[in-house]
């Protein structure tokens, strides 16, 4: 089981009321994330678990390709290193606490310098050698869905408690494309939440129709450039006008699948790795209940 950790703790923060630690610090995201993990482990009983981390939430190599990529979330540009992301003031202090608690539990936290959690997930899900559940609220990861390799997404767009199990049939029914076409579909459609403009005038229906007819983005572009190809003049013009965008967007949308990651140490712990540290963290931050719940679930897994 691969967790898109930031996607989960952001949802925990915005989906839960303020919960204060003894010192008055809000810890709702910490508690919510721990309860999410408890629920998922209890329901799915994974043998391995990794909390995948954004070591760089807006990698420079993606920004160099499309400068609007996540630009609306930047609060401070940093010349060397990741830009500062807009994060609520009462969520920001909770992130290091999350790291400490996960470490005390012995739950693997996996990141890669210069890459997003999506890229870590893409790499770990590829050739995993076992069934993989990807837990995320990010639709981009639908591109990883693969029935043959038993890779599916547990989509938490509507909340972890109401997550949807995304397989190839789900993607087909929802968007009218195959999971293997989803990255091209997302490239054509665009995604305002990530600052990806898409092809102007091409929405989900047109993107699905084009992929159904031509198969992939390369063939769509080839048809648009071929006067003899059967393509409506208006669509042809839109694809042609987006040529510069389409030259680079596929590399931004596609998640990495070949990062040099250490795959050892991903087994689900059956007990906390550092009980003393975990107890101290639980006392300091008022986390007794969620820590006890997750400890109990791990012992039963």
Predicted regions: what they are:
Residues 1-135, 139-161, 165-167, 247-248, ...:
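Noncatalytic, basic helical substrate-engagement surface that gates or grips nucleic-acid strands
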């Amino acid at each position: 089981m691969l967790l898109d950790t930031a996607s989960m703790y952001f949802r925990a923060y915005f989906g839960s009321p303020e919960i204060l630690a003894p010192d008055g610090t809000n810890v709702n995201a910490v508690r919510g994330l721990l309860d999410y993990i408890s629920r998922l482990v209890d329901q799915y009983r994974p043998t391995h678990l990794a909390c995948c981390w954004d070591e760089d939430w807006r990698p420079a190599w993606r920004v160099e390709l499309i400068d609007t990529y996540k630009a609306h979330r930047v609060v401070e540009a940093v010349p060397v290193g990741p830009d500062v992301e807009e994060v609520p003031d009462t969520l920001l202090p909770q992130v290091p606490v999350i790291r400490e608690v996960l470490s005390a539990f012995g739950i693997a936290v996996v990141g890669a310098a210069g890459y997003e959690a999506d890229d870590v997930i893409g790499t770990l899900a590829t050739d995993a050698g076992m069934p993989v559940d990807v837990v995320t609220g990010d639709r981009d990861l639908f591109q990883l869905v693969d029935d043959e390799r038993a890779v599916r997404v547990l989509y938490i767009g509507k909340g972890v408690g109401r997550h949807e199990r995304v397989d190839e049939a789900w993607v087909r029914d929802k968007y009218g494309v195959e999971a293997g076409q989803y990255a091209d579909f997302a490239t054509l459609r665009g995604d305002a939440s990530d600052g990806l403009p898409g092809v102007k005038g091409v929405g989900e229906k047109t993107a699905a129709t084009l992929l159904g007819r031509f198969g992939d983005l390369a063939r769509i572009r080839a048809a648009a450039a071929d006067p003899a190809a059967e393509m409506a003049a208006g669509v042809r013009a839109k694809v042609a006008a987006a040529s510069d965008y389409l030259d680079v967007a596929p590399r931004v949308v596609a998640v990495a699948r070949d990062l040099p990651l250490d795959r050892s140490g991903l087994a689900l712990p059956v007990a906390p790795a550092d009980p003393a540290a975990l107890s101290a963290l639980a006392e300091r931050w008022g986390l007794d209940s969620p820590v006890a719940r997750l400890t109990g679930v791990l012992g039963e897994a």
